[in-house]
């Protein structure tokens, strides 16, 4: 097993300042289980996890102590002039097998769906996925489990 630590500002010896940085440094061998321990704080990140066999756990006393937050939304106009759309509005996209999220809050802060459209907090298109003691927050289409039709 390979264990990593993420803390705001990387104030933990040998740790990472963001989940994206930790994802990039994971062992390439998918057979090696990885546990990422996330220290309390708010992480403003849009995440995509494609490596299997990963556990991400908040190190706080409750899920509200460790928050992964982003604010993309479906009606947002992209640089190419096209709306972002529902399925690109996620805060956290999991596209890998054998993933566990534990003791975390994952939120999409886009706001009112009448003006912003759909805004997915967690998009899980995977096998053997577990979200344990997690808070998943948003205003519309908060959780999406794929695949797309």
Outline where the language-model segments fall.
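Short aromatic-glycine-(Arg/Gly/Cys) micro-motifs in beta-strand/loop hairpins
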Residues: 1-8
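Short acidic, gly/pro-rich beta-turn/loop elements at beta-sheet edges
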Residues: 46-48, 66, 78, 111, ...
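Right-handed parallel beta-helix
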Residues: 92-149
């Amino acid at each position: 097993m390979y264990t990593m630590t993420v803390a705001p500002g990387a104030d933990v010896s040998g740790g990472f300042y963001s989940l994206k940085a930790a994802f990039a440094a994971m062992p390439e061998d998918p057979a090696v289980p990885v546990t990422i321990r996330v220290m309390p704080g708010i992480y403003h990140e849009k995440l995509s996890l494609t490596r299997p066999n990963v556990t991400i756990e908040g190190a706080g006393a409750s899920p509200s102590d460790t928050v992964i937050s982003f604010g993309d939304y479906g009606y947002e106009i992209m640089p190419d002039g096209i709306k972002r759309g529902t399925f690109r509005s996620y805060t956290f996209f999991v596209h890998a097998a054998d993933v566990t999220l534990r003791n975390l809050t994952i939120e999409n802060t886009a706001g009112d769906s009448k003006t912003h459209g759909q805004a997915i907090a967690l998009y899980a298109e995977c096998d053997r996925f577990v979200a344990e003691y997690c808070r998943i927050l948003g205003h519309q289409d908060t959780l999406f489990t794929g695949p797309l039709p």
